[in-house]
Regions:
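C-terminal motif of bacterial Sec signal peptides marking the signal peptidase cleavage site
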Residues: 15-17
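Sec-dependent signal peptide recognition
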Residues: 2-10
Length: 376
């Protein structure tokens, strides 16, 4: 904990004097700002890597042969006025003020333990209407929308070499690359804020085949494929908030759907474009009323004539206009090692100025990816 505090203190001090404006938005080649691992993630919290476009956030594991990309939309929350007829805006405790005089008296008498116990009991929210799917009563929580599972299908024994996954902070791109049975595989992921889509590109040096499925823990009320666009509709049990997901597959191979599984065959590449929306509307008193299907369809209509390079260039221009405003140079890092090994070394007091630089810029990457105008 002390080490992390030291990193935070250093980057805050240095950042005050290291800001500059860059309007050219040219791709950077700073390899010190590439954070990478040499193995797939097994834990969502500590190893999976985040992406976002201000509306959708996703976490990718980099699995082989199956990739999992977990994602959600920023407004997909339980709770709210539609979660219960007697909703009072979040476990409100209307009697809390009555205990303030007693608390003040206890504190004046230096009876702090008693004051703390009373405050914990009477000044905090009272959980109401708890039920199996609403453990904290009216206190809602962000929900996982679901996961894409994308599997390379092959009859060969699946051995891999030269594995690498990570995030290039210069571009805001996630990546996975490896070799299996003489075939080079490459994945490029990014969130595009201007076009409101998440983009996942899979490439291979020889034609390959894939299966793609979308799993959600919530109730679904519709699944359809028309052309190269797949859609899924569902809702939350807690407050009946509706959500919709559109996915578009572009590929040089064949694409078809059977049941709720998408098959991409004989492809050197395919690109999965993902849009998601909910019925949330920022209007009192119900905060509901948007049409998520219409929102997603409009997003896809707007990119209907756009190529992958168009969408890529839009993302780079938008991201780098913000990211390139600040440079921080503390010294050479140990970027020949994966980030998890560097963290272990750092915890053992091995100097790694580049790691401190990465953490500073990684924080900025998360803010750019997760908090944009129009989002939550």
């Amino acid at each position: 904990m002390m080490i992390l505090k030291a990193i935070f203190f250093i980057i805050v001090l240095v950042s005050i004097s290291c800001s500059k404006t860059n309007t050219e938005n040219q791709p950077s080649t700073n390899e010190d700002l590439i954070m990478w691992y040499n193995k797939p993630a097994t834990d969502w919290m500590t190893e999976a890597l985040p992406l976002g476009n201000g509306y959708i956030g996703s976490m990718f594991f980099g699995g082989v042969p199956t990739e999992e990309i977990q994602f959600t939309e920023g407004s997909l929350w339980t709770g709210g006025p539609d979660s219960h007829p007697k909703y009072n805006f979040g476990n409100n405790n209307p009697d809390a003020h009555e205990f303030l005089p007693v608390l003040r008296e206890l504190m004046a008498e230096d009876r702090f333990d008693e004051a703390n116990e009373l405050a914990q009991k009477e000044l905090t929210s009272k959980i109401q209407y708890a039920r199996p799917t609403q453990y904290y009563g009216e206190f809602g929580a962000q929900q996982n929308l679901g996961s894409f599972f994308i599997t390379v299908t092959t009859d060969k024994a699946y051995s891999i070499s030269d594995y690498k996954r990570g995030i290039d902070l210069n571009t805001g791109h996630g990546f996975v690359q490896y070799t299996s049975d003489g075939i080079d595989y490459k994945r490029t992921y990014f969130g595009n804020y201007p076009d409101k889509v998440m983009v996942y590109r899979f490439e291979s040096s020889e034609p390959s085949s894939y299966t793609i499925s979308l799993s959600t823990p919530h109730y679904t009320s519709g699944f359809a494929m028309y052309g190269n666009i797949i859609s899924k509709t569902g809702y939350l049990e807690d407050n009946n908030m509706r959500f919709h997901v559109n996915s578009r597959i572009d590929s040089d191979g064949s694409v078809h759907c059977s049941g709720d599984t998408i098959y991409v065959n004989n492809a050197n590449y395919f690109v999965l474009y993902n849009a998601a929306a909910t019925s949330y509307k920022n209007e009192f008193p119900h905060y509901s009323g948007n049409n998520p299907m219409q929102i997603c369809n409009t997003i896809f209509d707007n990119i209907a004539s756009s190529t992958y390079n168009d969408i890529l260039n839009n993302q780079l221009s938008d991201y780098q206009e913000l990211f390139n405003r600040v440079e921080l140079e503390l010294g050479k890092g140990n970027n020949d090692k994966p980030i998890d090994e560097r963290l272990v070394d750092y915890s053992n007091y091995t100097q790694d100025l580049g790691l401190e630089e990465i953490y500073f810029q990684y924080g900025r990457y998360l803010m750019i990816s997760g908090s944009r105008k129009g989002g939550m």
